[in-house]
Amino acid sequence: MHGFLGEFLGTMVLIVFGVGSGAAMNLKGNYARHQNWTFICLAWGLAVTFGVYVAGQFGSDGHLNPAVTVGFALFGYLPMANVWPYLLGQFLGAFIGAVIVIIQYYPHFQAAKTAADGNQVGIFATGPAISNPVFNFLSETIATFFFIFVLLNLGNFTQGLKPLMVGLLIVVVGQTLGGTTGFAINPARDWAPRLAYTILPVPNKGLANWGYAWVPMFGPLLGGILAAGLETIIS
């Protein structure tokens, strides 16, 4: 199970801070409500930074993202033996991270009686600003492609200041390409919290919009594969 613990802990940190920022910004009755898109992008960027640092200390490459893992593995940047431990750690860590956010904000979910009070699946998972399945899919593919293409050129991104560079990359992707879909660019970041929201007793919750969930699953996976493939061809 090489790297499982690092991916589990790193992804858990990522989701606690990232989804936590969504809860803070949206839920009625907390001091951070009504922040803006820049707040969200910065929070997710720093969440990735600290998640990568944690993962690297526990024996993984700090992927925290199935799109990274699958793309890297298919083109020889990661041993195939590491794929399933990494994926399991990522999805399980993301689920537990979402559970922690639910516990942290439980009274606020209770107070948020309607969607206008901020209690909606968008705290946990992504959704399109304008619903257009084809272009939503392309948006996730393109955003993930550029994220992973740059990532491949950072080398070992768990060491030194590299995790900060990864975090800044997330901020740039979010600010420039993420406004269309909320930039999942990570199937585990979307599916595991969406599942937690679906099956756990979150007070006053709405629908989890599983009809959209194929977009943040397969768009990022395709983007990661294309980025790793291009890097292999040109390097």
UniProtKB/Swiss-Prot annotation:
Q: Which residues form a coiled coil?
A: none
Q: Which UniProt keywords apply?
A: Cell membrane, Membrane, Transmembrane, Transmembrane helix, Transport
The way it spans or sits in the membrane comes to: Multi-pass membrane protein
Compartments reported by the entry? Cell membrane
Answer whether the UniProt record assigns the keyword Oxidoreductase to this protein: no
Keyword Mitochondrion recorded: no
- GO CC: one term? plasma membrane
Give the main localization category.
membrane
PROSITE patterns in the record, alphabetically? MIP
**UniProt similarity note:** Belongs to the MIP/aquaporin (TC 1.A.8) family.
What protein name does the entry list? Answer: Glycerol uptake facilitator protein 2
Q: Which organism is it from?
A: Lactiplantibacillus plantarum (strain ATCC BAA-793 / NCIMB 8826 / WCFS1) (Lactobacillus plantarum)
Q: What is the lineage of its organism?
A: Bacteria, Bacillati, Bacillota, Bacilli, Lactobacillales
Question: What gene does this protein come from?
Answer: glpF2
